[in-house]
Each structure stands twice: as C-alpha cells, then as structure tokens.
C-alpha cells in the first residue's frame, strides 16, 4: 500500500559496487513508475460491447507474470489518437479468463507498449494449472495456461 492505495510498480535499477553496512546489496534507482492495477471486471452479460473486442498482443517478457496474486501483462496495441483505451480481464468460464480491449475506434495508430496488472485474489496457484488466459491478437485468438506465466 502507498498512501492507502494498493499499487504495483516497476523499477529500473543498477547494482552499485560500493560495500554496504547491511547484508544486502546497494542499488541506484534509475527509473520507477506505477503500473495501472485493477480488479477483474464483472461478467460479460450486458457488458460485452463495453469491454470491446479490439486486438492486442501480449509480450513474452519478464514483465508478463503471475505472482503474488497479481497478473501483470506487458502488451502492445495501436494507439493513434487521443482516445482512451480500456483494458479489462473477465472470467468468462470457471476455467477461462479473457483479456479484452475497447480501443474506442483507435486501432490504426503506431504500435506502442503498455503494462497493466489485475488482482487475482481468488485464484490459487493450484488453480492456475487449469485456468486459461484468452485474448484476441492481431493474428487471431490466442490462449496460454495461467501457470505458464509463473516465474
């Protein structure tokens, strides 16, 4: 928690060569930024159009990870204008989570990166062996087992 808010962060740092007075290592923080963190969205039902079905790509990187009851996703999508893109995670079946994007018609711009995190408090590590993450990519629908995102 930070100021009463639950926040995920990403830190770019380098190890220092200097000796420290404690058992750990000293680092210099080069950059630190917060990651948008949210709960999963309510079920689809009447919200299907609200959640959108615009494509995005998940990037297989160290920042795409399921750990500590959070699913953090590094993604790429087209950002062309000044329209807000909405990214949501919905549980569409007992064993399926679906990542959805509503780009509000803003799909033709240059491809850019983004990070988003979702709280998965009710999903145990054992459940991750059976749960599938599904999303619409630029090349069609893709899936991955949640357990494959544990590092």
Predicted regions and their residues:
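Short, exposed beta-strand-loop hairpins at the edges of beta-sheets
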Residues: 18-22, 121-143
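His-enriched metal-coordination microenvironments in redox/metal-binding proteins
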Residues: 63-95, 108-112
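An anionic, turn-rich surface loop/hairpin at beta-sheet edges
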Residues: 94-120
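Hydrophobic residues positioned within well-ordered beta-strands of beta-sheet architectures
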Residues: 9-11, 71-73, 114-118
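Beta-strand/beta-sandwich contexts
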Residues: 39-65
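Short nucleic-acid-contacting surface segments enriched for D/E, G, S/T with interspersed K/R
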Residues: 1-11
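OB-fold/S1-family single-stranded nucleic acid-binding modules
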Residues: 14-44, 142-144
């Amino acid at each position: 928690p930070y100021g009463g808010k639950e926040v995920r962060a990403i830190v770019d740092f380098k190890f220092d060569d200097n000796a420290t007075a404690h058992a750990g290592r000293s680092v210099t923080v080069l950059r630190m930024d917060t990651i948008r963190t949210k709960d999963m969205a309510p079920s689809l039902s009447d919200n299907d159009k609200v959640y959108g079905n615009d494509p995005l790509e998940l990037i297989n990187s160290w920042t795409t990870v399921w750990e500590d009851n959070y699913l953090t996703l590094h993604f790429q999508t087209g950002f062309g204008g000044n329209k807000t893109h909405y990214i949501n995670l919905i549980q569409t079946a007992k064993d399926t989570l679906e990542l959805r994007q509503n780009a509000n018609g803003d799909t033709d711009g240059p491809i850019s990166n983004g990070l988003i995190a979702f709280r998965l408090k009710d999903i145990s590590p054992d459940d991750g062996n059976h749960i599938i993450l599904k999303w619409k990519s630029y090349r069609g629908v893709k899936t991955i087992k949640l357990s494959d995102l544990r590092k």
